[in-house]
Amino acid sequence: MKHVGSYEELASFTSVKGNLGFDTVFEAVFMIFGPRLNIAQRYVDLLANTGIERGLLGPHEANRLWDRHLLNSAVVAELLDPGDRVVDIGSGAGLPGLPLAIARPDLQVVLLEPLLRRVTFLREVVAELGLDVEVVRGRAEELWVRDRIGERDVAVSRAVAALDKLTKWSIPLLRPGGQILAIKGEHVFDEIHQHRRVMASLGAVDVMVVVCGANYLCRPVTVVLTRCGQQMRHKPARVGDRKTQ
């Protein structure tokens, strides 16, 4: 993990690097997944077939599942402590939650996803891979979701929403001092500037930008890291009735 404070500094990490000590993507894959590489490979196979067939990923993603999706997600594990309780908000096809669970079996991972077709896929994948991962169909803003999954140490997300919405959804699911880890793109500082006041009003503190995987990825991953303030926490409004899981 590297802390960055400007676009110039971020560019020095996220531009393509040619000499990282790894000749192929698969060397980085082996470093990250190690003895669980066969599980990661099976997940890639499921994404490339069932995932694309059901429209969870576009067909053009099939040839870049390892570098663009699995590695991009799994390197966030650099920011997680042993045994962390993690919720993946808007998990979609299981990103970043499933790569994290594969790379770090010590984590307690919940995949939170509102759409039935995605939830069905996620439950099939979890069963197929034999992962100790819970899949919950629901939205982060629903009160029963917090009751179901409890207060988490970390809320992760990838390509889900802007930081104001992510903060609103994440804070009620976190313990005091818990972390929000949002994988973001090249306009991250503009987004922070735009939403910082709203984030602070919702209880987010210590907002920073970090990059993960700088030692072994050609394009390290940009993550917004912020914490749930100790004193200010908002409970979600009750939305609808409890859904059948």
Curated annotation (Swiss-Prot):
Domain of life: Bacteria
Classification via CDD domains: AdoMet_MTases
Coiled-coil residues: none
Main location: cytoplasm
InterPro entries associated with the record: rRNA_ssu_MeTfrase_G, SAM-dependent_MTases_sf
Molecular function, one GO term: rRNA (guanine-N7-)-methyltransferase activity
EC class of the enzyme, as a word: transferase
GO terms for cellular component: cytosol
Gene3D superfamilies: Vaccinia Virus protein VP39
EC number of the protein: 2.1.1.-
Keywords: Cytoplasm, Methyltransferase, rRNA processing, S-adenosyl-L-methionine, Transferase
Binding-site list for S-adenosyl-L-methionine: G90, L95, A140, E141, R158
UniProt-annotated location(s): Cytoplasm
Family statement: Belongs to the methyltransferase superfamily. RNA methyltransferase RsmG family.
Protein task: Specifically methylates the N7 position of guanine in position 518 of 16S rRNA.
The protein's name in its UniProt record: Ribosomal RNA small subunit methyltransferase G
Organism this protein belongs to: Mycobacterium leprae (strain TN)
